Amino acid sequence: MTAFSPTLGELRNVVDAELTDFLAGRRAALPEAGELIVEIQRLLEAGGKRLRPAFCYWGYRAAGKPHSAAIVRSAASLELLHTFAIVHDDIMDQSSTRRGVPTSFALGGVSFALLVGDLALVFADDAIMASDFPPPALAGAFAAYSRMRQEVIAGQFLDVKMAGDPLVTEEEARRVAVLKSGRYSIQEPLAIGAALAGAPSALEDGLAGYGEPLGEAFQLRDDLLGIFGDSSRTGKPIDSDIREGKRHVLYAKTVASLSGGERDDFTRLWGAGADLGAEDIVHLRELTECSGARAATEGLLKALTATAYERLRGLPLDGDARGALEALTRESTDRQS
């Protein structure tokens, strides 16, 4: 048993080393898919915060369990799942860059990117099932893992479905945020870690109660960065969400706050893609700001974050787990990328 208690940076390094070893083994076993595996490795090396592995890891440690190679392997599997999700998301959005590098879609087209994403998903399944936990623990964790996969796909579908609705409501947008990112990014990773640890149901419920508002706050921060962030830090153009016509909470709040010609302009231009000029982007961003939608979204984000902190304080955790989850809460909501 070891007392190793990694910082977020140290944990990322450990997870990345595990991913590199895992992919090297898969490349040796399946050389025919070598190009696809190299592409998965390229995407992982491009960056990413590794928040999903971190929440899984600390969901496990929250139950009083020590650091182990098995939990690192399980946590790392969630980064492979995330790779699947973002590669397919880039296809649907026809995105050219992510994390400051070309997307798989931009490099090889739809067929190549589909196969990269599909293989990442298969590898994610392999990694979590090969993590050396007892079968009962794996069964409980895989139930949460299965929910995670289903929810991100359902959320993505709703996101695509709403793209043609200029009058999407805030309630609808929040539902998509919870499914597409909130539960998938935080709540389910915590549940997977807790299940692997055999955590009591009271702790599992407490972690879920903490993760739910935090997950939604995480997505709201992502939406704000997509419009008002610094592209040199986010790794993607800050006009991409506007050109693609993202129907997120920020959009819904703006539409609800505008009226008359301003509202007509906003709904007509938002999502107009390559037809938008630089002045149109500035105009749309200004409408989002002057309508009060940006401030209202920030206010909702802060309220959700406060709820998450309050629920975290009520959990019976040791100092290491509490400190790590507090740091992850800040990382999820105060980030600039």
Q: What role is predicted for each listed range?
A:
Residues 3-7, 43, 173-178, 202, ...:
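Non-transmembrane, amphipathic alpha-helical segments
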Residues 15, 23, 40, 120-121, ...:
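Hydrophobic alpha-helical core bundles mediating ligand binding, dimerization, or RNAP-core interactions
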Residues 9, 139, 143, 208, ...:
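Short, charged, amphipathic alpha-helical segments
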Residues 304, 310, 316-337:
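Short, amphipathic C-terminal "tail helix"
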Residues 28-263, 333:
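Mg2+-dependent prenyl diphosphate-binding active-site environment of isoprenoid biosynthetic enzymes
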Residues 264-313:
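Mobile late-domain/C-terminal helix-loop "cap" segments
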Residues 12-16, 89, 142, 146, ...:
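Hydrophobic core segments within long, regular secondary-structure runs in both alpha-
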Residues 1-27:
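N-terminal amphipathic/basic leader segments beginning at the initiator methionine
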